[in-house]
């Protein structure tokens, strides 16, 4: 019985796309804060000014803390989709930024998604990738973070009053922050087509589904058998072995 084959590159790209959002959000706020204060009445160097940036870290602590137990219950794919939704809502809320409270709450939401992505995505990519390619695939998340930071500085330049588009300072910063909603939407749409982690499927006793994912990713029945056996052994060791 044939199944529609999804390109491994597609899977790895969209699996790691959360890293781009992580990097973009990290870089874009430095440019946006030059103009946010004037519109919202935030004094430079004040507690309120610093907390706009720090609020993401507060959310990231929460996101990283809860993602592990949740991913073991709900699965990597489902939480990747939830993270994309949180990214999208946080990006739009930050870009609207009609008040200081809305901006901070939206940044906390972004932080939750950032923390979740930084803990979830490397694990997800490692569990999907063949053993001989795992190291290289694992670097994709970091590569995406760097790409996101680069794009953030490009957008900061283009959308600033003296930049390529020459937008008014009370308009440009909104767009700087809202642009993150585009890759967030792409992450959600692409994530719908991603497979579940075979390790998670094995943990849930869905051996046939796990084998099919490994077959799709590896295309080698011998390698599939080895990966499947390894996943089963790890599951038994973690959940059934009494030390």
Language model: regions and residue ranges:
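Transmembrane-helix signature of 12-pass secondary carriers
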Residues: 1-243
